[in-house]
Curated annotation (Swiss-Prot):
Encoding gene (name): slyX
Family affiliation: Belongs to the SlyX family.
Lineage: Bacteria, Pseudomonadati, Pseudomonadota, Gammaproteobacteria, Alteromonadales
Classification via PANTHER family: PROTEIN SLYX
InterPro entries the UniProt entry points to: SlyX
Disulfides per UniProt: none
Protein name: Protein SlyX homolog
Length: 70
């Protein structure tokens, strides 16, 4: 009977440890999810600002004349 009690106690300790680990992982997932949402918002803002910028007076790469050594 003592062996069975030891096995049950060991299983209970493992479950308690796993519960703590799951809670820590859940906390990290929540933090990362919030960080991702914030970064997505920032990217959305940057993209809207980028699209709003007027094109520059510089010629595009395809319109540039090649340098003299070509």
């Amino acid at each position: 009977m003592d062996n069975l009690e030891n096995r049950v106690e060991e299983l209970e300790m493992k479950i308690a440890f796993q519960d703590g680990t799951i809670e820590e992982l859940n906390t990290q997932v929540i933090k990362l999810n919030n960080l991702l949402a914030s970064q997505q918002d920032q990217l959305r803002i940057l993209l809207s600002k980028l699209h709003a910028v007027e094109p520059s007076n510089m010629a595009s790469q395809s319109e540039e004349t090649p340098p003299p050594h070509y």
